């Protein structure tokens, strides 16, 4: 099969539009006007995006297997206690799949690149909500069960998801309806303000993560005495937390390629490492959640607020609907703005 694949030409950073540039990456860029077929074939040759795709596409199947196992082994239709885990596992399938698709098809055009990453951001925001829903059901420390914070936790997490998707999309192109019929380049763009775009994007995902983990951080690092939920899952939660901060560090710093531009273009650059750390961290997060779910089942069913459709699947459906609406609002100006060829050339 590989012998039938026509290898695509790769380009250096000076041969592609600035919208496609990555910090510290000098070579290995695909053609910025690739067809969908060429994008797929490019996954079977080494470019600076190849491992970005595979490091998320392959783990998607692992998380899908975990999801299907729960669906087949548990009485999910009648057992509401499993619903938060289902939402979390589904979000674990969605975010790496959306990421791998974004990295695959982002070289079709400037517009396609933006839209692909809009969906990527929406999927990451949905994953943050999936984490919050599972934390509310299984991870909250005993001392905080049925507290006022617990009562509003999911509602705030839903709002954070909407805010995260909006801010992340804004970080690429600014307000979506500003200069609706004008070229993209006339609006705020990542190309014009790369540092501000990076700060906004980090904020868009750091804030929901920090909020989601308030009960976990309190449980692990602050709480002493009774009501602190000290069990075997805590050490696994710590592993996930360390990997989450390492993931954030790699995403924010672009190390090691910033120290040696061109050395890590194909293998070993920060985005690949960031993907690997994120997936391993998600694995430990899933393991810790499943441990808490089993170890604390009787206590949570007796003391925690009742798990309902509204605070699990309903919240997830609302998040998906609103995020898709936000993505559409940000994407429409790209699809209908004037002079598409000129816009692509300027970008």
From Swiss-Prot:
Q: Which InterPro entries match?
A: AdipoR/HlyIII-related (IPR004254)
The reply on keyword Membrane is yes
UniProt subcellular location: Membrane
Q: Which GO terms describe its biological process?
A: oogenesis
Domain of life assignment: Eukaryota
Ordered alphabetically, the record's keywords are: Developmental protein, Differentiation, Lipid-binding, Membrane, Oogenesis, Receptor, Steroid-binding, Transmembrane, Transmembrane helix
Q: Which residues lie on this side of the membrane: Cytoplasmic?
A: 1-52, 103-114, 160-201, 257-314
Bilayer topology annotation: Multi-pass membrane protein
Q: What does the UniProt record say this protein does?
A: Steroid membrane receptor. Binds progesterone. May be involved in oocyte maturation.
The record's section on PANTHER family has: ADIPOR/PROGESTIN RECEPTOR-RELATED, MEMBRANE PROGESTIN RECEPTOR GAMMA
Name of the molecule in the record: Membrane progestin receptor gamma-B
